[in-house]
Amino acid sequence: RIVNLSLLAGDWYIDQMKRKAYESDGVPISFTKDQYHAGVRDFVTIEERVQQPFSMKEVMEFVASDRPETKSNRYQGGAVDFIPTRNLYIPVDKEKVLVNGTVQPEDSALIVDRVEIQLKGNSLTKSQLMVLDILATNNWERPIYFGVGMGQDSYMGFDKYFQLEGAAYRVVPIKTENNAAYYDFGRINTEILYDNLMNKFVWGNIKDPKVNIDHFHDNTIAVMKYRNTFLRLAEQLMQEAATETRVMGDTIINEITDSTKIQEAIRVLDKSLEEIPLYQVPADFFLLNYIPIYYAAGEQEKGNDLAWALALDNAQTLRYIGSLSPNRRKALENDERRSMQALQMLVDMARRNGENAFAQEIQDMVESTLSGRPVTSKRVNKNFPMASQEK
């Protein structure tokens, strides 16, 4: 059942969510109509009267109560509903979450005793209050997901318990520190995410050159971060494939213990570039991180082809910016800086992986671009052609 958080402040919408719709049971909300109708609990203040954490269910019952002691008189205009602590938790029944598939058996040792969050700000909207109530009332019965494209504030602290499963994060009782490098959240179960991306998801006609992918579609694809999701899966597969390190004399050797996962990582990146091709959807910064994976997996040609495609794209950006008047060029300084940074990264990656001749080829292209000379190269991109190469 999809819940639109922008509408969840409306009593009429909460009514709809609580009702059964076709084969979908109503969303588990404990508040009754008289407790959430228009003008009632439109916002709830947060007052740190106690430091100790309380169960989210207890706090929801406190907020829903009309007893005088559950109201705050600190504000003008009368009594206001409040939450007496920032620290909330949902208890976890370990046996239950294993039996109903919330957590896979191989991850059983990672299950926490309770999911803990800390509320931010000074108040909650009715929509935010309903989100907390849904999670508390559900009590691990049904899967609960948050969309990938939502802002972090909408996650209300549950992002520490996310599991990325494609276009959404599932709330699971496993704590994971966020990966700030990718501005992304959650852990990855490679078996689940691989099956979704490679077998279950239908990608439509994005890759059909006859289909026009306009700026709106570009933005949608960027917001959903599909390429980043493919990347994160491939990186996790590579990490799981190379888990054994041993010392031989003075040399540290990282051994590949699972070649199957290496092949899966390659297929994941290939699938990403097949379904969301460069000739349809513009390159983004995430694609730079595909290249080291191709190199590490022994796919030198694919690594070089992708690096060359990205080098051409960034060189074209520099060539365009260089053709502008000084005033217009100044407005694009950040784009110019990003392209220069990307090109330097491509050269460095190639050299680190022993592709010195190829690195020099990129360097020569950059120098030709910056000096205004035409770029000449006989290189043919067999794997990842770009629209700019065909024009």
Each model region followed by its residue ranges:
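ER/secretory pathway lumenal C-terminal domains and tails of membrane proteins involved
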Residues: 1-391
